[in-house]
């Protein structure tokens, strides 16, 4: 069965704790994931204050000028606790590079590619990583006919937290209605549906942490399952064939590097073991801004490896950088 990696594999800090004292925490934002970011931000603010930093919470809204004003004078580091559009897609990263302020998590390019699921899929294919069959389709194409054999998944190309995701099985007649109500741009990403289990692997720079087996209370690991208390059960380390366990760690690390990520990421997988073990492992996406809420997966994995939440947040601050 699967085993966690050694505790001494958790990466050490890149710079000294004393080199950064003043930290601004960006949270909230303008995406569909604003509510999640508000919770993440509050958790991070409390943790960094406990760690001894001077913390300025900055609730981000629609006016960029307000955010820039809140970062003047510049802090030593910006902790990016935003999720979704503007916070996770390279936009705020570009602003912070322009301002010359070091920030946590990935830079502009990696963030932009990871947020664009079709672009990320292309990068994963180029790196030889296992992905589901799929393609981009226009909303008009989706309305006219099934783009893939059923069952298949419809998802926005640029959203996270399972926002806007639909699974269509045989006999499900919602396709036309989904296309009519689609509010995520003129295209959708459709992929074959992979049966089996939902897995995730956290990565801190050059180390994959462990594999979590996610058991949602509902049939689908949706937004409610991700963030509601009791919405899902997390089994870590995942109980699975050791070869598949190691493969998940290796693919997560390779995906992190394929996109050029830095700091913390979390790779999500489907694992089809319906025909026995070892099963088929399929990479879904890399999250460059993993959730930091009380039910979030990355903090759980870090804790299993001996890194509590305060230490995890401190580590993220110590890894902060920019391209200015």
Stretches found by the model and what they are:
Residues 137, 165-171, 202-205, 272, ...:
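Short beta-strand-to-turn element immediately C-terminal to the catalytic PLP-Schiff-base lysine
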Residues 37, 132-133, 152-178, 198:
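Glycine-rich phosphate-binding loop of ATP-grasp-fold ATP-dependent ligases
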Residues 1-109, 113-115, 119, 126, ...:
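ATP-binding N-terminal substructure of ATP-dependent carboxylate-amine bond-forming enzymes
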Residues 2-3, 14, 125, 242-324:
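ATP-dependent carboxylate activation and anion-phosphoryl transfer catalytic cores
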Residues 170-250, 278-282:
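Phosphate-binding site of ATP-dependent enzymes
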Residues 55, 102-103, 131, 152, ...:
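Hydrophobic beta-strand scaffold residues
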Residues 124-125, 148-163, 185-199:
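ATP-grasp fold ATP-binding core
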């Amino acid at each position: 069965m699967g085993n966690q990696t050694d505790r001494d594999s958790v990466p050490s800090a890149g710079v000294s704790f004393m080199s950064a004292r003043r930290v601004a925490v960006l949270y909230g934002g303008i995406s569909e994931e604003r509510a999640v970011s508000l919770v993440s931000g509050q958790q991070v603010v409390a943790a960094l204050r406990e760690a001894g930093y001077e913390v300025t919470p900055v609730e981000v809204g629609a006016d960029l000028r307000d955010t820039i004003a809140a970062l003047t004078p510049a802090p030593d580091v910006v902790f990016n606790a935003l999720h979704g559009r503007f916070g996770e897609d390279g936009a705020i990263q570009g602003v912070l590079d322009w301002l010359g302020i070091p920030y946590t998590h990935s830079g502009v390019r990696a963030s932009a590619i990871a947020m664009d699921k079709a672009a990320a899929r292309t990068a994963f294919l180029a790196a030889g990583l296992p992905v589901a069959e799929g393609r981009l389709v226009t909303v008009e194409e989706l309305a006219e006919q099934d783009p893939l054999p059923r069952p298949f998944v419809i998802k926005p190309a640029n959203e996270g937290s399972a926002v806007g995701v639909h699974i269509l099985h045989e006999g499900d007649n919602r396709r036309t209605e989904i296309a009519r109500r689609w509010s995520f741009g003129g295209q959708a990403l459709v992929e074959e549906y992979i049966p089996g289990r939902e897995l995730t692997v956290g990565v801190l720079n050059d180390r994959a942490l462990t594999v979590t087996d996610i058991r949602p209370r509902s049939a689908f690991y949706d937004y409610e399952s991700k963030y509601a208390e009791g919405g899902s059960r997390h089994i870590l380390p995942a109980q699975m064939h050791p070869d598949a366990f190691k493969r998940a760690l290796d693919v997560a690390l390779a995906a992190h590097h394929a996109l050029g990520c830095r700091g913390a990421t979390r790779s999500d997988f489907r694992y089809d073991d319906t025909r026995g073990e070892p099963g088929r492992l399929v990479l879904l996406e890399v999250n460059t801004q993993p959730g930091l809420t009380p039910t979030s997966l990355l903090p759980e994995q870090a804790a299993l490896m001996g890194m509590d939440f305060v230490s995890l947040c401190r580590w993220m601050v110590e890894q902060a950088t920019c391209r200015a």
